[in-house]
């Protein structure tokens, strides 16, 4: 009897200080077949990003403990092959844009975010 080979599910880490955004991202990506881990603390998110191998990390730019630039820098330093997507409602400086693989405005997240993450995960 033949076995069906399925591609393993991709695992995402979403880091945002807004519980509502995290809930939205979880629902959106789980409906698209991803395994989603969410974290509201930037520092704990960084710990998770270094402890586990995620297929992509999504993060907010403005967070209280650590801003998105510093968080992206640390993830890039510790996990250089992990795609990082900045999701933000504010303008992202060019220096930060150069640290990440993609920037998606929060107001366009529902249209653009899943396709951006899928494209980056397929690169791996």
Explain the meaning of each model-derived region.
Residues 9-20, 25-29, 57:
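Conserved acidic segment of CheY-like receiver
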Residues 60:
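Active-site residues of response regulator receiver
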Residues 63:
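Receiver (REC) domain active-site loop signature in two-component systems and cognate sites
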Residues 53-55, 79-83:
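His-Asp phosphorelay/catalytic-motif detector in bacterial-type signaling
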Residues 1-11, 109-124:
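Non-catalytic signal-transmission and effector/linker regions of two-component phosphorelay proteins
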Residues 47, 69-80:
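Short amphipathic alpha-helix used as the core "switch/output" element in two-component signaling
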Residues 38-47, 68:
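Helix N-cap/capping motif at the beta->alpha junctions
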């Amino acid at each position: 009897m033949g076995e069906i080979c399925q591609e393993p599910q991709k695992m995402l880490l979403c880091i945002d200080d807004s519980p509502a955004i995290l809930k939205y991202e979880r629902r959106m990506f789980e409906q698209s077949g991803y395994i989603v881990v969410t974290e509201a603390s930037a520092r704990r998110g960084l710990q998770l990003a270094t402890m586990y191998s995620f297929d992509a990390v999504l993060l907010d730019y403005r967070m209280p403990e650590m801003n998105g630039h510093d968080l992206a820098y640390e993830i890039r330093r510790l996990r250089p092959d992990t795609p990082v997507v900045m999701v933000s409602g504010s303008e992202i400086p060019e220096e930060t844009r150069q640290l990440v693989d993609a920037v998606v405005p929060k107001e366009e997240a529902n249209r653009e975010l899943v396709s951006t993450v899928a494209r980056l995960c397929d690169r791996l």
